[in-house]
Amino acid sequence: MRFLLLSPELFLAEGGIARILRLYLKALCELAGPEGRVDSLVLNDRPGLDPRLPLYTAGNLREQVGCRRDKLRFLLQAVRLGRRNDKLVCGHLHLLPVARLAGWFNPRLEYYLVAHGIDVWRPYGPAERWALRGARRILCVSEYTRRQILRFCPDLNPADLVVVPNTLDPLLAPATVAPAAAALRGSGPRILTVGRLASTDTYKGYDTLIEALPLVRRVHPNATLRIVGGGDDEPRLRRLAQQQGVTDAVTFTGRIDDAALRAEYAACDLFALPSRKEGFGLVFLEAMIHGKPCLGARAGAVPEVITEPVGALADYGNIPEIAAAVTDLVQHPRDPAAIRARADSFAFPAFQRHLAAVLLAP
């Protein structure tokens, strides 16, 4: 089997979409088999091979093309590569019209969309609707995302929308992180959150964690919050920490590598991301595989991932409820084995089986 993967980015950024599309690349390279090949076309990444690429390609990658945000080059390359492949997997709705255009030059090419979250929770333009109608299947990361697509495009056949949950990158599974984790641990409850600190992503709820921290510290005076990630919203969040009087209890680590991230997960007492617009919430799995309880918002697809045995939910923006949930997770620890078992249900082999069942179906 010959596959073409279209991605907005793979290695340029560390957002959730880039991380999951690396795993799509890994799965496609393994599904292609010894006689198959995979081509990868990326809109935003720079030309050349990222040193991490071999970790995801299993020797079956035929060509990797980065277009450095050149949309015309991306379109022309999609047509060229589409001519020699059997199936095209499109990693973002914005790229889907390109996938349909590629099909004009190869009538046997079937294309599929990976639908994540807020990228598809909205009304669609004419070109997007046209492209959606031509998709062989739409792979939704959650049932919530599936319902949102049908809400905004009700003329689609519901049977063509299938749920393929996100998966955990095996590279982020626990490794030998004990010394690094021990160096990070403090004397009080340690709350961890991870993500891009972008001014366009204020819905993530980092500010609500900062606002809840003074309430948490009334019960646990040594509680701290570590915010992993960088972006243009960091100055605002730093000012908020100062206004709340918790500057000394909030640490901004900036962007870190995978080894440091594993150490952060291992060292924390709980993970929190009270976001109101998560199509899945990949970071929850990353925390769960380390046996850490998770706090999320009662919104989007998060309730599909966080269940009572592994964490807690709070209404988005409800500061007292967020603080109470954090306190409950500290005072009533969840079973790490049960948490890891929940993460294991989303492990890469299960993801690969789900994907194969869709892509290889007659």
Language model: regions and residue ranges:
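Conserved donor-binding/catalytic core segment of Leloir-type glycosyltransferases
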Residues: L4-L6, A183-K204, I210-L213
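Short His-centered aromatic/hydrophobic patch
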Residues: C90-L96
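Carbohydrate-associated surface elements
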Residues: Y144, T167
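Nucleotide-activated donor-binding/catalytic signature segment of Leloir-type glycosyltransferases, i.e.
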Residues: P235-I256
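Short alpha-helical donor nucleotide-sugar binding micro-motif in glycosyltransferases
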Residues: R255-I256, A263-C268
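Aromatic "clamp/platform" in nucleotide-sugar-dependent glycosyltransferases that forms part
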Residues: R276
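Short hydrophobic beta-strand element within catalytic cores of glycosyltransferases
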Residues: P293-G296
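Conserved acidic donor-binding segment of nucleotide-sugar-dependent glycosyltransferases
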Residues: E308, A312-I319, D328-P333
